[in-house]
């Protein structure tokens, strides 16, 4: 479940995503990412479901995973990003699953309204999913106004139906050399993992693992 607590205020792209890898014959053949976007070309909001093959497309091309169309209008003409109105303070649940062999669907449910929207299907010959993670990709300046988002109820389900809910995560940050900012942070609060940007100071030391259990609280405290 994903929620924007403090929305961006600048005309820059923010992408908050759930990413999964596609597995076939014991190896990961590609990955897809789905989530909400704050997008300069989509004033009411956008949603994305797209991805890439590992090591390039099997038959050449740019490595982009093929997919179906969508009932949602395209943003800037591309297949991945679609217009989707969303609001800060509302909870959205993303689900990636296979409705048919060779098809992997992402859908988003507005939990306040109880409405589910199918984004589109990616067409990948894979028998399962692996390596789930969530991330924030922010193209704003480090000193732009703060933002805050929350992730909760991170869950993976086996083919048998057995569900596994994450109670801890491994943290990574983009390095300063690669264009990252020192004033972003991820911490645990209640039953949520919180991601913030635009802090007034550099983040404290970063733990390798962040857990919801106990009283760990803010990362590095």
List the predicted regions and their residue ranges.
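Secretory/extracellular carbohydrate-interaction modules
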Residues: 1-68, 81, 180-181, 196, ...
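Activation corresponds to long, low-complexity, non-globular regions
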Residues: 2-12, 132-221
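Short, well-ordered strand-loop elements centered on a beta-strand within folded domains, enriched
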Residues: 13-15, 45-49, 103-109, 132, ...
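Generic structural signal for short, solvent-exposed loop/turn connectors between secondary structure elements
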Residues: 42-45, 98-104, 125-130
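Short, aromatic/His-centered strand-loop micro-motif at the edge of beta-sheets
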Residues: 65-93
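Extracellular glycan-recognition regions
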Residues: 83, 109-130, 209-220
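Carbohydrate-binding surfaces in secreted/extracellular proteins
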Residues: 86-118
